[in-house]
Amino acid sequence: MGSQWGKDKVYRRAMNEGFRSRAAYKLQEIQERFSIIREDDNIVDLGAAPGSWLQVERTLTKGKVLGVDLNPIPSIDGVMTVVGDLTTSEVQQQVKDLVGVVNVVLCDASPKLSGHKCYDQARAIGLGEDALMFAARTMKQGGNMAMKSFQGEMFHELLEEVKKHFYVVKTFHTKSTRRGSTEIYIVAKNFIGSSGDVEGHIQ
């Protein structure tokens, strides 16, 4: 653990409270502000490892909670997990089989950063596009979504794409985000319903 993490008060608080990362507080802030999770909702969390959002989700709903990630997610009581690529039809079908009706799709994932701003931005937008595609193919009409993104040249295009699929779309900066970060969340409510088509790749 680097000195930056060791000195991070929010990180230390998360560890003391039993969360796997500081990201748990970001979901708590989103829920407090937008009430995207209802007490009986079934939730699918994309890019869920190490599982801090799953820990919070389990406390917010009596419904099913499932995390999807390329890497194994350490077990959490009452939470199902799938190891695989969220863009594949096999994983999407597995999610449907396990969860049934999907009311909420969440994605706090971000790509491994290379240090090259344009490249990292493109990969982050691509991940957001994949999450939106997943939601469009699996979510029940009227469902809600929240996903992490990063401000930059292509962010507005992703935001406009999300607006095609949800009646209400907002952006949100959490207090738990590190100072100076371009991280931003897209919060989308009341899924319109679609055939699952998301237009192309954002250029």
Swiss-Prot record:
Major enzyme class: transferase
Entry annotation: catalytic residues: 148
GO MF term (any one): rRNA (uridine-2'-O-)-methyltransferase activity
GO terms under cellular component: cytoplasm
SUPFAM superfamilies: S-adenosyl-L-methionine-dependent methyltransferases
Amino acids binding S-adenosyl-L-methionine: 51, 53, 69, 85, 108
InterPro entries in the cross-refs: RNA_methyltr_RlmE, RNA_MeTrfase_FtsJ_dom, rRNA-MeTfrase_E, SAM-dependent_MTases_sf
Pfam families: FtsJ
Alphabetized UniProt keyword annotations: Cytoplasm, Methyltransferase, rRNA processing, S-adenosyl-L-methionine, Transferase
Subcellular location(s) per record: Cytoplasm
UniProt catalytic activity: uridine(2552) in 23S rRNA + S-adenosyl-L-methionine = 2'-O-methyluridine(2552) in 23S rRNA + S-adenosyl-L-homocysteine + H(+)
EC number: 2.1.1.166
Family as reported in the entry's similarity comment: Belongs to the class I-like SAM-binding methyltransferase superfamily. RNA methyltransferase RlmE family.
Entries under PANTHER family matching the protein: PRE-RRNA 2'-O-RIBOSE RNA METHYLTRANSFERASE FTSJ3, RIBOSOMAL RNA METHYLTRANSFERASE
Biological function: Specifically methylates the uridine in position 2552 of 23S rRNA at the 2'-O position of the ribose in the fully assembled 50S ribosomal subunit.
Designated name of the protein: Ribosomal RNA large subunit methyltransferase E
Gene coding for it: rlmE
